Amino acid sequence: MITIARTASRLALALSLAALPAAALAQDAKDAPKWDVAAPPGVKIREVPLNVEEGTWMNLDISPDGQTIAFDLLGDIYTMPISGGTPTRIGEGLPYETQPRFSPDGKRIAFTSDRGGGDNIWIMNRDGSDKRQLTNESFRLMNQPSWSPDGKYIVAKKHFTTQRSLGTGEVWLYHVSGGDGVLLVKRPSEAHQKELGEPIFAPDGKSIYFTRNTTPGPIFQYAQDSNNQVFAIERYELDSGKTEHVIGGEGGAVRPTPSPDGKKMAYVRREATQSRLYIRDLATGTDRKVFDALDMDSQETWAVTGVYPNMAWTPDSASVVVWAGGKLNRVDVATGKSSVIPFRVTDSRGVIDPPLPRVAVAPDSFETKMPRSATVSPDGKQVVFETLGKLWIKPMAGGDARRLTADEAAMEAYPSWSADGKRIAYVRWTDADLGEVRVIGATGGKSTVLATAGHYKRPVFSPDGKIVVFEKDAGGYLTSPRGSVEPGIYRVPSTGGTSVKITVNATRPQFGAANDRVFVMEGDAKESRLVSLDLNGEARRIHAKGELVNDYRVSPDGQYLAFRQNYQAFVVPLMPGSQEVNLSHKGGALPVTKASGDGADWIHWS
């Protein structure tokens, strides 16, 4: 038995867009307490004592006068004398704060913090006072700040994700007084998944060093061969805008750290399974290995915040201080001799205990957690949805759900009601026979096959119920490559017959009020378009477009348009004719009403 009452009903009600009074549609959580990373409302913070003489993945920097070292440890920032001792915590609390960098005058420290809700670049005084946010990214990740020699600018990495959740970086320049920043080193494409980061100013301020994954192609792969060149150090010239290769070769080169006198470059190279500290003479191109005992860098894996932690030169360009083996190690670059800078941190960390639900391993009945494709019947009395690979119908007023079919041999998905509420179109799937588009009565019984042996999605009835339109996709990745010829949007009589292709390179077919025009979605992950065509794929019109919009839903009367942007559902009037409108949840040419509270999936009109 499958208990589904609460989850399915809530999902259908939350995602059904009924008539349009703003108060009924938009239930924003305006009265909820504002979220504060440093003091989250409604949670209990427990202090855990800390007494350590070493740390993991510690970023560090040395003050311009050479007297003070700053470092991060478990998300807090400390300063202490360069000789070692008891550190002073200058950045603390629940926000995770890392990568401290002294300003050229030594009075301020730039750092990375999620204090504002996401990783951004912040600036504080040397003693930790007057923290202020420099960058204001709400979607991208910012990290790895570095000051210009005149103290007027900060260069940092901005991280971009892709459809795979992996991504790459760009190098951006920010004035310390604020602003949106200036792009210096652009990613090769929006689909690029190879890392770029670790920016740092040259001592003369004329160029910026950074690291780039130089392996062929745009797609990231795990377990790359670090014996060859995975990463290389490059230089961006501010005057010309040109980029040139600086250091690479076998074992790669990461974490570029130029000496204050501009004559040398400290960097990390891999030798077999061991990361080593090297020094490059920038005049002659000669490399010397000066320290063997680094921890493993992250060349083969993912390095959003850097391939190795920040290290720093002493002001006389004679020594490099680098984290390794849990310690802060001072390495004399002339002799290769190293010594540990001792420290002991005795304080605490605030932690919030996670929820600990009790989960029965194998109950006789259970509540499904992921009902999908919930669609309310035209009369508003029932909802059909898919869970555990089967289609179910449930009264909107509550009560038990029932199976729509008695088919135990196949998976079922993408249910859609006819306008009269008497039939449901859906997709049936088996690995052996592939997919079929079918129509069945809302009370169950025998189904009619409309399309066979293919990869199908989202069948939808025309308003008069005479036509079903659907997507035909291509397999070959996780599914069989069979049945993949001529993908596109098709139409077929709802009683059966020959399928006719309407268009290609489109998805999510649907109707508005008319039987002779089909709406589809075109575009890519960044920007999509709502387009309509006649049943022969002609008389094309663009109605709307929007960045990061991944779903459009035209109301049955053709008067309104629901769209999904940034995981939320919004509603706007649908302009008649071929008036192209730019959509944004922030508003614009048309009034926008938010229709969801805490996210929206499978939006549809009742």
Where is each model-derived feature located?
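Sec/Tat signal peptide C-region and signal peptidase I cleavage site
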Residues: 22-26
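A short helix->beta-strand "capping" segment at the edge of beta-propeller domains
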Residues: 34-57, 352-371, 587-592
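Bacterial N-terminal signal peptides
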Residues: 10-20
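Residue-level detector of Asp-centered blade-edge/turn motifs that repeat once per structural unit
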Residues: 64-65, 104-105, 149-150, 203-204, ...
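A flexible loop/linker signature enriched in serine peptidases of the S9 family
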Residues: 27-28, 53-54, 72-78, 91-97, ...
